[in-house]
Amino acid sequence: MSYHLEKLNIKFIINQALIEIKNCKNIKELELIRIYWIGKNGFFSKKNKLLNILFPYEDFIKKDMLKKAYKKIKYIYFKKKQKIKNKEIKIKIFKEKIDISLPGRDVCNGSFHPISNIIRYSEKFFCSLGFSIVHGHEVENIYYNFDALNIPENHPSRTEHDTFWINENCLLRTQTSGIQIKVMESKKPPLKIISSGKVYRNDHDKTHTPMFHQLEGLMIDECIGISIVKSILYDFCYSLLGKKIKIRFRPSYFPFTEPSAEIDIMNEDGKWIEILGCGIVHPKILHNLKIDRNKYSGMAFGIGIERLAMLYYKLSDVRPLFINNLRFLKQFK
């Protein structure tokens, strides 16, 4: 498109630019029109330069008309540009709109593992009776795991068949009872503590796993007898598993308690399942820890969390609790 200076028709120029702007369909076409008409080296820029060269002190009317035409075309250009942008935004919104009539996606909430549920409930129960929670290390030395608990050197639990040894003096703890010794060393009676955590024994079948969880309890005070042990643990079992369960309290043997007992609960198949051991803290242990055994006595118990989980969730085998099968675990939400 070319226009001679002497035949400059402002109305024709404006109309021509308006037609071109009106007919463009996208930003790319509009940008080409802008460059031609009002760009740095566009139509108006060239005409102004030519007028300044030929008539530097004259023809102010034509210069003014060109300036007004330039402003008008620029205004129309920006208006058209905004219109195209708005249209593109509407198209984009339409394409990306969400159909709110469609059902939303389910939110998959996590939940506590069955083992964690039993531990949390057990801790809550004993804390309501005034027990405090303490924690210990899973790697223990031979003194706290065996010697301090009155377990002699020739005891079967010290062999490799039952215990995972790290070296001659360290092992993976076989019970959480070692924590009781550390508490009795550092604090004076009366004491009421519980401790839960992983323990390790070299045993694996449908009711045993090499790693399992225990909740250990200790109470040191005046006049603690076996009847108190039995009463507290019966209340715990009834609270967790219901009043209709059948419980058996039978004598047993543990090196660190005297007398000792075990509690069994009957499962749905009519079989007795051992869930915990308990007893009165052996006087020798109190004496070794410089606790006056004529004034104080103590009760101790160790609960098998997996056994409780089997009874609570009606499981016949403990091993599925450790295979991380979501289809199995989701049913316990």
Swiss-Prot record:
Its main location: cytoplasm. It catalyses: tRNA(Phe) + L-phenylalanine + ATP = L-phenylalanyl-tRNA(Phe) + AMP + diphosphate + H(+). CDD domains: PheRS_alpha_core. PANTHER family: PHENYLALANINE--TRNA LIGASE, MITOCHONDRIAL, PHENYLALANYL-TRNA SYNTHETASE. Mg(2+) binds at E258. Belongs to the class-II aminoacyl-tRNA synthetase family. Phe-tRNA synthetase alpha subunit type 1 subfamily. GO terms for molecular function: ATP binding; magnesium ion binding; phenylalanine-tRNA ligase activity; tRNA binding. It comes from Wigglesworthia glossinidia brevipalpis. Tetramer of two alpha and two beta subunits. GO terms for cellular component: cytoplasm. Gene3D superfamilies: Bira Bifunctional Protein, Domain 2. It is found in: Cytoplasm. Its cofactor is Mg(2+). Its EC number is 6.1.1.20. Keywords: Aminoacyl-tRNA synthetase, ATP-binding, Cytoplasm, Ligase, Magnesium, Metal-binding, Nucleotide-binding, Protein biosynthesis. Binds 2 magnesium ions per tetramer. This is Phenylalanine--tRNA ligase alpha subunit. It comes from the Bacteria. SUPFAM superfamilies: Class II aaRS and biotin synthetases (SSF55681), tRNA-binding arm (SSF46589). GO terms for biological process: phenylalanyl-tRNA aminoacylation.
